[in-house]
Amino acid sequence: MAAEKPHMNLAVIGHIDHGKSTTVGRLLFETGTVPPHIIESFRKEAESKGKGSFEFAWVMDSLKEERERGITIDIAHKRFDTDKYYFTVVDCPGHRDFVKNMITGASQADAALLVVAAPDGVMEQTKEHVFLSRTLGINQLIIGINKMDAAKYDEKRYNEVKEQLSQLLKMVGYKPDDISFIPMSAFVGDNIAKKSENTPWYKGPTVLDALNALSEPEKPTNLPMRLPIQDVYSISGIGTVPVGRVETGIMKKGMKVSFMPANKEGEIKSIEMHHEEIPQALPGDNVGFNVRGIGKGDIRRGDVCGPSDVPPTVAEEFIAQVVVLHHPSALTVGYTPVFHCHTAQIACSFVELMKKLDPRTGQVKEENPTFLKTGDAAIVKIRPTQPMVIEKVKEIPQLGRFAVRDMGSTIAAGVCMDITPKQMR
Protein backbone atom coordinates (compact mmCIF):
# COMPACT_ATOMS: atom_id res chain seq x y z
CA MET A 1 0.00 0.00 0.00
CA ALA A 2 1.53 3.31 -1.07
CA ALA A 3 1.84 5.96 1.61
CA GLU A 4 -1.42 7.83 2.02
CA LYS A 5 -1.54 11.11 0.09
CA PRO A 6 -1.93 14.24 2.19
CA HIS A 7 -5.56 14.96 2.93
CA MET A 8 -7.42 18.22 2.25
CA ASN A 9 -10.92 19.24 3.28
CA LEU A 10 -12.50 21.21 0.43
CA ALA A 11 -15.58 23.39 0.90
CA VAL A 12 -17.54 24.01 -2.30
CA ILE A 13 -19.32 27.32 -1.86
CA GLY A 14 -21.39 29.77 -3.89
CA HIS A 15 -24.89 31.04 -4.59
CA ILE A 16 -27.79 28.62 -4.93
CA ASP A 17 -28.14 27.12 -8.44
CA HIS A 18 -24.73 28.36 -9.57
CA GLY A 19 -23.64 24.75 -10.09
CA LYS A 20 -22.03 23.56 -6.85
CA SER A 21 -23.46 20.01 -6.99
CA THR A 22 -22.74 19.68 -10.68
CA THR A 23 -19.16 20.78 -10.04
CA VAL A 24 -18.73 18.20 -7.28
CA GLY A 25 -20.33 15.55 -9.51
CA ARG A 26 -17.99 16.46 -12.36
CA LEU A 27 -14.91 16.27 -10.11
CA LEU A 28 -16.00 12.83 -8.86
CA PHE A 29 -16.70 11.72 -12.43
CA GLU A 30 -13.41 13.00 -13.87
CA THR A 31 -11.30 11.50 -11.07
CA GLY A 32 -12.92 8.08 -11.53
CA THR A 33 -14.67 8.24 -8.18
CA VAL A 34 -18.18 7.44 -9.39
CA PRO A 35 -18.07 3.62 -9.33
CA PRO A 36 -18.01 2.02 -12.81
CA HIS A 37 -21.08 -0.16 -12.03
CA ILE A 38 -23.13 2.99 -11.40
CA ILE A 39 -21.96 4.50 -14.69
CA GLU A 40 -22.68 1.18 -16.43
CA SER A 41 -26.23 1.03 -15.10
CA PHE A 42 -26.86 4.57 -16.38
CA ARG A 43 -25.37 3.69 -19.73
CA LYS A 44 -27.82 0.77 -20.05
CA GLU A 45 -30.71 2.96 -18.94
CA ALA A 46 -29.70 5.66 -21.43
CA GLU A 47 -29.55 3.11 -24.25
CA SER A 48 -32.90 1.59 -23.33
CA LYS A 49 -34.41 5.07 -23.54
CA GLY A 50 -32.85 5.54 -26.95
CA LYS A 51 -30.36 8.09 -25.67
CA GLY A 52 -27.39 6.44 -27.29
CA SER A 53 -24.90 9.04 -26.23
CA PHE A 54 -24.25 8.41 -22.57
CA GLU A 55 -23.66 11.74 -20.92
CA PHE A 56 -22.28 12.95 -17.65
CA ALA A 57 -25.66 14.57 -17.10
CA TRP A 58 -27.06 11.13 -16.39
CA VAL A 59 -24.68 10.64 -13.50
CA MET A 60 -25.71 13.96 -12.03
CA ASP A 61 -29.42 13.31 -12.48
CA SER A 62 -29.12 9.99 -10.74
CA LEU A 63 -27.23 11.48 -7.81
CA LYS A 64 -29.94 14.14 -7.68
CA GLU A 65 -32.68 11.49 -7.72
CA GLU A 66 -30.96 9.67 -4.88
CA ARG A 67 -31.05 12.92 -2.95
CA GLU A 68 -34.71 13.50 -3.78
CA ARG A 69 -35.59 9.99 -2.67
CA GLY A 70 -33.99 10.93 0.61
CA ILE A 71 -30.92 8.76 0.13
CA THR A 72 -27.98 10.96 0.82
CA ILE A 73 -24.95 10.03 -1.18
CA ASP A 74 -22.70 8.42 1.35
CA ILE A 75 -19.43 10.09 2.17
CA ALA A 76 -17.46 7.60 0.04
CA HIS A 77 -18.82 9.40 -2.99
CA LYS A 78 -17.52 12.67 -1.65
CA ARG A 79 -13.87 11.68 -1.60
CA PHE A 80 -11.76 12.09 -4.71
CA ASP A 81 -8.07 11.90 -5.48
CA THR A 82 -5.83 14.16 -7.51
CA ASP A 83 -2.17 13.40 -8.27
CA LYS A 84 -1.06 15.09 -5.08
CA TYR A 85 -3.91 14.98 -2.55
CA TYR A 86 -6.99 13.16 -1.56
CA PHE A 87 -9.89 15.52 -1.00
CA THR A 88 -12.98 15.24 1.13
CA VAL A 89 -15.76 17.57 0.04
CA VAL A 90 -17.15 18.97 3.28
CA ASP A 91 -20.87 19.79 3.45
CA CYS A 92 -21.76 22.53 1.08
CA PRO A 93 -23.66 25.58 2.29
CA GLY A 94 -27.36 25.10 2.11
CA HIS A 95 -27.05 22.18 4.48
CA ARG A 96 -28.33 23.52 7.77
CA ASP A 97 -25.30 22.33 9.67
CA PHE A 98 -22.71 23.50 7.14
CA VAL A 99 -21.72 26.54 9.13
CA LYS A 100 -21.94 24.79 12.47
CA ASN A 101 -19.68 22.01 11.16
CA MET A 102 -17.29 24.43 9.57
CA ILE A 103 -16.93 26.37 12.77
CA THR A 104 -16.89 23.72 15.42
CA GLY A 105 -14.17 21.96 13.46
CA ALA A 106 -16.11 18.85 12.48
CA SER A 107 -15.06 19.72 8.98
CA GLN A 108 -12.73 22.66 9.11
CA ALA A 109 -12.02 23.34 5.45
CA ASP A 110 -8.41 23.73 4.29
CA ALA A 111 -9.48 25.36 1.04
CA ALA A 112 -12.63 26.47 -0.74
CA LEU A 113 -13.80 26.25 -4.34
CA LEU A 114 -16.15 29.16 -5.03
CA VAL A 115 -18.55 28.51 -7.91
CA VAL A 116 -20.00 31.61 -9.62
CA ALA A 117 -22.30 31.39 -12.64
CA ALA A 118 -21.02 33.57 -15.49
CA PRO A 119 -24.50 34.74 -16.60
CA ASP A 120 -25.40 35.98 -13.08
CA GLY A 121 -22.07 37.09 -11.65
CA VAL A 122 -21.77 37.93 -7.95
CA MET A 123 -24.98 37.29 -5.99
CA GLU A 124 -26.03 37.63 -2.34
CA GLN A 125 -24.81 34.22 -1.13
CA THR A 126 -21.60 34.63 -3.12
CA LYS A 127 -20.83 37.60 -0.87
CA GLU A 128 -21.97 35.85 2.28
CA HIS A 129 -19.91 32.72 1.64
CA VAL A 130 -16.77 34.71 0.79
CA PHE A 131 -17.12 36.72 3.99
CA LEU A 132 -17.74 33.55 6.01
CA SER A 133 -14.72 31.80 4.47
CA ARG A 134 -12.57 34.75 5.43
CA THR A 135 -14.00 34.92 8.97
CA LEU A 136 -13.43 31.20 9.41
CA GLY A 137 -9.83 31.45 8.31
CA ILE A 138 -9.97 29.61 4.98
CA ASN A 139 -6.89 31.10 3.33
CA GLN A 140 -6.80 29.16 0.06
CA LEU A 141 -9.45 29.87 -2.51
CA ILE A 142 -10.03 28.73 -6.10
CA ILE A 143 -12.72 30.39 -8.20
CA GLY A 144 -14.64 28.61 -10.93
CA ILE A 145 -16.59 30.96 -13.18
CA ASN A 146 -19.15 28.37 -14.21
CA LYS A 147 -21.79 28.00 -16.94
CA MET A 148 -19.45 29.53 -19.53
CA ASP A 149 -21.44 27.51 -22.10
CA ALA A 150 -24.51 29.60 -21.21
CA ALA A 151 -22.39 32.75 -21.60
CA LYS A 152 -21.29 31.56 -25.07
CA TYR A 153 -17.68 31.29 -23.83
CA ASP A 154 -17.43 35.07 -24.02
CA GLU A 155 -14.08 36.31 -22.72
CA LYS A 156 -15.51 39.78 -22.08
CA ARG A 157 -18.21 38.37 -19.77
CA TYR A 158 -15.61 36.24 -17.96
CA ASN A 159 -13.47 39.34 -17.34
CA GLU A 160 -16.47 41.32 -16.04
CA VAL A 161 -17.30 38.63 -13.50
CA LYS A 162 -13.63 38.26 -12.58
CA GLU A 163 -13.48 42.02 -11.92
CA GLN A 164 -16.65 41.95 -9.74
CA LEU A 165 -15.15 39.09 -7.75
CA SER A 166 -11.77 40.79 -7.39
CA GLN A 167 -13.47 43.82 -5.81
CA LEU A 168 -15.38 41.59 -3.39
CA LEU A 169 -12.29 39.57 -2.46
CA LYS A 170 -10.24 42.72 -1.80
CA MET A 171 -13.00 44.10 0.40
CA VAL A 172 -12.90 41.11 2.74
CA GLY A 173 -9.11 40.85 2.73
CA TYR A 174 -8.20 38.20 0.15
CA LYS A 175 -5.54 38.99 -2.48
CA PRO A 176 -7.07 38.39 -5.93
CA ASP A 177 -3.57 38.07 -7.45
CA ASP A 178 -2.94 34.91 -5.41
CA ILE A 179 -6.16 33.24 -6.55
CA SER A 180 -6.87 31.12 -9.65
CA PHE A 181 -9.91 32.23 -11.66
CA ILE A 182 -11.02 29.50 -14.06
CA PRO A 183 -13.65 29.79 -16.81
CA MET A 184 -15.49 26.47 -16.72
CA SER A 185 -18.63 24.53 -17.44
CA ALA A 186 -19.22 21.74 -14.94
CA PHE A 187 -22.05 20.44 -17.11
CA VAL A 188 -20.07 20.28 -20.36
CA GLY A 189 -16.77 19.57 -18.62
CA ASP A 190 -14.78 22.60 -19.81
CA ASN A 191 -11.51 23.24 -17.93
CA ILE A 192 -12.29 20.81 -15.12
CA ALA A 193 -9.88 17.97 -15.91
CA LYS A 194 -8.58 19.12 -19.28
CA LYS A 195 -8.12 22.38 -21.14
CA SER A 196 -11.15 23.29 -23.19
CA GLU A 197 -11.05 24.22 -26.87
CA ASN A 198 -14.06 26.44 -26.19
CA THR A 199 -11.88 28.93 -24.28
CA PRO A 200 -8.76 29.35 -26.47
CA TRP A 201 -8.25 32.77 -24.85
CA TYR A 202 -7.72 31.21 -21.41
CA LYS A 203 -4.14 30.25 -20.57
CA GLY A 204 -4.43 29.23 -16.90
CA PRO A 205 -4.84 25.93 -15.03
CA THR A 206 -7.81 23.55 -15.03
CA VAL A 207 -9.73 23.05 -11.78
CA LEU A 208 -7.83 19.82 -11.06
CA ASP A 209 -4.50 21.58 -11.76
CA ALA A 210 -5.47 24.34 -9.34
CA LEU A 211 -6.47 21.79 -6.67
CA ASN A 212 -3.10 20.06 -7.10
CA ALA A 213 -1.32 23.40 -6.72
CA LEU A 214 -2.83 24.17 -3.28
CA SER A 215 -0.31 24.17 -0.48
CA GLU A 216 -0.45 21.39 2.04
CA PRO A 217 -2.16 22.41 5.27
CA GLU A 218 0.44 22.80 7.99
CA LYS A 219 -0.12 20.89 11.19
CA PRO A 220 -0.24 23.42 14.02
CA THR A 221 2.47 21.62 16.03
CA ASN A 222 4.13 24.89 17.13
CA LEU A 223 1.09 26.01 19.15
CA PRO A 224 0.46 25.01 22.78
CA MET A 225 -1.04 21.52 23.06
CA ARG A 226 -4.85 21.48 23.20
CA LEU A 227 -7.06 18.41 23.31
CA PRO A 228 -10.82 18.90 23.87
CA ILE A 229 -12.25 15.85 25.63
CA GLN A 230 -14.90 13.81 23.84
CA ASP A 231 -15.35 11.06 26.45
CA VAL A 232 -13.83 9.75 29.67
CA TYR A 233 -13.49 6.03 30.37
CA SER A 234 -12.43 4.13 33.45
CA ILE A 235 -10.53 1.01 32.46
CA SER A 236 -9.73 -1.58 35.12
CA GLY A 237 -6.04 -2.12 35.68
CA ILE A 238 -5.23 1.12 33.83
CA GLY A 239 -7.27 3.91 35.39
CA THR A 240 -8.88 7.03 33.92
CA VAL A 241 -8.66 7.28 30.12
CA PRO A 242 -9.86 10.52 28.48
CA VAL A 243 -10.40 10.35 24.70
CA GLY A 244 -10.26 13.15 22.13
CA ARG A 245 -8.53 14.64 19.12
CA VAL A 246 -5.35 16.66 19.44
CA GLU A 247 -6.20 20.03 17.86
CA THR A 248 -2.87 21.81 18.28
CA GLY A 249 0.61 21.15 19.60
CA ILE A 250 2.13 17.80 20.53
CA MET A 251 1.00 15.57 23.37
CA LYS A 252 3.90 13.63 24.87
CA LYS A 253 4.26 10.85 27.39
CA GLY A 254 5.42 12.23 30.76
CA MET A 255 3.90 15.67 30.10
CA LYS A 256 2.34 17.50 33.04
CA VAL A 257 -1.14 18.59 32.01
CA SER A 258 -4.07 20.68 33.25
CA PHE A 259 -7.72 20.05 32.47
CA MET A 260 -9.84 23.20 32.28
CA PRO A 261 -12.31 24.35 33.45
CA ALA A 262 -12.21 21.30 35.80
CA ASN A 263 -8.95 22.77 37.16
CA LYS A 264 -7.36 19.33 37.64
CA GLU A 265 -3.71 18.43 37.10
CA GLY A 266 -2.04 15.18 36.19
CA GLU A 267 0.76 13.53 34.28
CA ILE A 268 0.40 11.59 31.04
CA LYS A 269 1.43 7.99 31.62
CA SER A 270 0.64 6.57 28.18
CA ILE A 271 -1.01 7.49 24.85
CA GLU A 272 -2.84 5.06 22.58
CA MET A 273 -4.05 5.38 19.00
CA HIS A 274 -5.81 2.56 17.12
CA HIS A 275 -5.09 0.26 20.10
CA GLU A 276 -1.35 0.80 19.87
CA GLU A 277 0.77 2.70 22.32
CA ILE A 278 2.52 5.75 20.83
CA PRO A 279 5.14 8.07 22.43
CA GLN A 280 3.47 11.26 21.19
CA ALA A 281 0.35 12.47 19.38
CA LEU A 282 0.09 15.18 16.71
CA PRO A 283 -2.75 17.46 15.55
CA GLY A 284 -5.50 15.41 13.94
CA ASP A 285 -4.70 12.28 15.97
CA ASN A 286 -7.65 10.73 17.82
CA VAL A 287 -6.20 9.27 20.99
CA GLY A 288 -6.97 7.78 24.36
CA PHE A 289 -4.50 8.62 27.11
CA ASN A 290 -3.99 7.61 30.69
CA VAL A 291 -3.39 10.33 33.27
CA ARG A 292 -1.85 9.81 36.70
CA GLY A 293 -3.67 11.75 39.42
CA ILE A 294 -7.06 12.13 37.71
CA GLY A 295 -10.24 10.28 38.68
CA LYS A 296 -13.07 9.52 36.23
CA GLY A 297 -15.38 11.93 38.03
CA ASP A 298 -12.85 14.79 37.87
CA ILE A 299 -13.16 15.57 34.17
CA ARG A 300 -15.84 15.39 31.49
CA ARG A 301 -16.65 16.05 27.82
CA GLY A 302 -16.08 19.74 27.02
CA ASP A 303 -13.05 20.05 29.30
CA VAL A 304 -9.79 20.80 27.48
CA CYS A 305 -6.40 19.27 28.23
CA GLY A 306 -3.27 21.42 27.86
CA PRO A 307 0.25 21.69 29.32
CA SER A 308 0.31 22.86 32.96
CA ASP A 309 2.62 25.76 32.09
CA VAL A 310 0.29 27.08 29.33
CA PRO A 311 -3.12 25.82 30.45
CA PRO A 312 -6.28 26.27 28.37
CA THR A 313 -7.93 29.68 28.85
CA VAL A 314 -11.18 29.82 30.83
CA ALA A 315 -13.28 32.86 29.92
CA GLU A 316 -15.08 35.08 32.42
CA GLU A 317 -16.37 36.83 29.31
CA PHE A 318 -15.16 37.29 25.75
CA ILE A 319 -15.53 39.58 22.75
CA ALA A 320 -16.57 37.88 19.54
CA GLN A 321 -17.28 38.65 15.93
CA VAL A 322 -20.51 36.91 14.95
CA VAL A 323 -22.66 36.47 11.86
CA VAL A 324 -26.38 35.94 12.49
CA LEU A 325 -27.39 33.15 10.14
CA HIS A 326 -30.97 32.53 11.11
CA HIS A 327 -32.95 34.17 13.90
CA PRO A 328 -36.77 34.19 13.77
CA SER A 329 -37.04 37.76 15.08
CA ALA A 330 -34.39 39.98 16.66
CA LEU A 331 -31.48 39.11 18.89
CA THR A 332 -31.05 41.47 21.86
CA VAL A 333 -28.96 41.83 25.03
CA GLY A 334 -29.83 39.09 27.53
CA TYR A 335 -30.38 36.39 24.89
CA THR A 336 -28.83 33.15 26.26
CA PRO A 337 -28.61 30.35 23.67
CA VAL A 338 -26.22 27.36 23.67
CA PHE A 339 -22.70 27.92 22.34
CA HIS A 340 -20.98 24.94 20.70
CA CYS A 341 -17.24 25.42 20.97
CA HIS A 342 -14.87 22.45 20.38
CA THR A 343 -16.58 19.64 22.39
CA ALA A 344 -18.25 21.99 24.91
CA GLN A 345 -21.91 23.03 24.79
CA ILE A 346 -22.60 25.83 27.21
CA ALA A 347 -25.35 28.44 27.56
CA CYS A 348 -23.86 31.92 27.13
CA SER A 349 -25.46 35.37 27.36
CA PHE A 350 -25.13 38.27 24.97
CA VAL A 351 -24.23 41.00 27.49
CA GLU A 352 -23.39 43.79 25.03
CA LEU A 353 -23.96 44.47 21.32
CA MET A 354 -20.91 46.62 20.59
CA LYS A 355 -20.86 47.24 16.84
CA LYS A 356 -22.85 46.21 13.80
CA LEU A 357 -20.64 45.51 10.76
CA ASP A 358 -21.29 45.47 7.05
CA PRO A 359 -21.24 41.69 6.47
CA ARG A 360 -19.57 42.15 3.09
CA THR A 361 -16.71 44.41 4.12
CA GLY A 362 -16.36 44.11 7.87
CA GLN A 363 -16.57 47.93 8.18
CA VAL A 364 -18.47 49.35 11.17
CA LYS A 365 -22.04 50.23 10.21
CA GLU A 366 -23.50 51.15 13.59
CA GLU A 367 -22.20 51.55 17.17
CA ASN A 368 -24.16 49.92 20.03
CA PRO A 369 -27.07 48.59 17.94
CA THR A 370 -30.24 47.77 19.91
CA PHE A 371 -30.75 44.42 18.16
CA LEU A 372 -29.32 42.07 15.52
CA LYS A 373 -31.29 40.18 12.88
CA THR A 374 -30.65 37.50 10.28
CA GLY A 375 -27.81 38.52 7.95
CA ASP A 376 -26.16 40.93 10.40
CA ALA A 377 -22.51 40.74 11.37
CA ALA A 378 -21.46 42.24 14.68
CA ILE A 379 -18.92 42.57 17.46
CA VAL A 380 -20.52 41.43 20.74
CA LYS A 381 -19.60 40.73 24.35
CA ILE A 382 -20.50 37.25 25.63
CA ARG A 383 -20.62 35.85 29.16
CA PRO A 384 -20.74 32.06 29.64
CA THR A 385 -23.21 30.91 32.34
CA GLN A 386 -20.68 28.25 33.43
CA PRO A 387 -16.89 28.10 33.14
CA MET A 388 -15.88 27.43 29.54
CA VAL A 389 -12.60 27.12 27.64
CA ILE A 390 -12.23 29.27 24.54
CA GLU A 391 -9.09 30.74 22.94
CA LYS A 392 -8.49 33.84 20.82
CA VAL A 393 -8.87 32.88 17.17
CA LYS A 394 -5.62 34.74 16.40
CA GLU A 395 -3.72 32.59 18.90
CA ILE A 396 -5.28 29.10 18.71
CA PRO A 397 -7.79 29.23 15.83
CA GLN A 398 -8.98 25.65 16.35
CA LEU A 399 -10.44 26.62 19.73
CA GLY A 400 -11.48 30.14 18.78
CA ARG A 401 -14.58 29.38 16.71
CA PHE A 402 -18.09 28.60 17.85
CA ALA A 403 -21.63 28.05 16.64
CA VAL A 404 -24.71 29.37 18.43
CA ARG A 405 -27.67 26.99 18.53
CA ASP A 406 -31.23 27.44 19.70
CA MET A 407 -34.53 25.71 18.94
CA GLY A 408 -32.82 23.05 16.89
CA SER A 409 -31.04 25.32 14.43
CA THR A 410 -27.83 27.27 14.08
CA ILE A 411 -28.62 30.88 14.95
CA ALA A 412 -25.17 32.38 14.53
CA ALA A 413 -21.52 31.59 14.04
CA GLY A 414 -18.50 33.41 15.27
CA VAL A 415 -14.91 33.72 16.34
CA CYS A 416 -13.41 34.85 19.63
CA MET A 417 -11.40 38.09 19.34
CA ASP A 418 -10.51 38.84 22.96
CA ILE A 419 -10.94 37.24 26.39
CA THR A 420 -11.27 38.37 29.99
CA PRO A 421 -9.77 35.25 31.58
CA LYS A 422 -11.19 33.73 34.75
CA GLN A 423 -8.55 33.28 37.46
CA MET A 424 -8.50 29.54 38.11
CA ARG A 425 -5.68 29.21 40.65
Swiss-Prot record:
E.C. no: 3.6.5.3
Stretches for region G5: 185-187
GO MF entries: GTP binding; GTPase activity; translation elongation factor activity
Renumbered residue ranges of the record's region G4: 146-149
InterPro entries: EFTu-like_2, G_TR_CS, GTP-eEF1A_C, P-loop_NTPase, Small_GTP-bd, T_Tr_GTP-bd_dom, TRAFAC_GTPase_members, Transl_B-barrel_sf
Region (G3): 91-94
GO CC terms, sorted: cytoplasm
Domain tr-type G residue range list: 5-221
Catalytic activity: GTP + H2O = GDP + phosphate + H(+)
Region (G1): 14-21
Compartment(s): Cytoplasm
UniProtKB keywords: Cytoplasm, Elongation factor, GTP-binding, Hydrolase, Magnesium, Metal-binding, Nucleotide-binding, Protein biosynthesis
Family annotation (Gene3D superfamilies): P-loop containing nucleotide triphosphate hydrolases, Translation factors
Binding site for GTP: 14-21, 91-95, 146-149
Principal EC category: hydrolase
Keyword Metal-binding (UniProt): yes
Record: residues binding Mg(2+): 21
Span list, region G2: 70-74
Pfam families to which the protein is assigned, alphabetical: GTP-eEF1A_C, GTP_EFTU, GTP_EFTU_D2
UniProt similarity note: Belongs to the TRAFAC class translation factor GTPase superfamily. Classic translation factor GTPase family. EF-Tu/EF-1A subfamily.
Family annotation (HAMAP family): EF_Tu_A
Stated role: GTP hydrolase that promotes the GTP-dependent binding of aminoacyl-tRNA to the A-site of ribosomes during protein biosynthesis.
Matches recorded under NCBIfam families: EF-1_alpha (TIGR00483), PRK12317.1 (NF008969), small_GTP (TIGR00231)
Name of the molecule in the record: Elongation factor 1-alpha
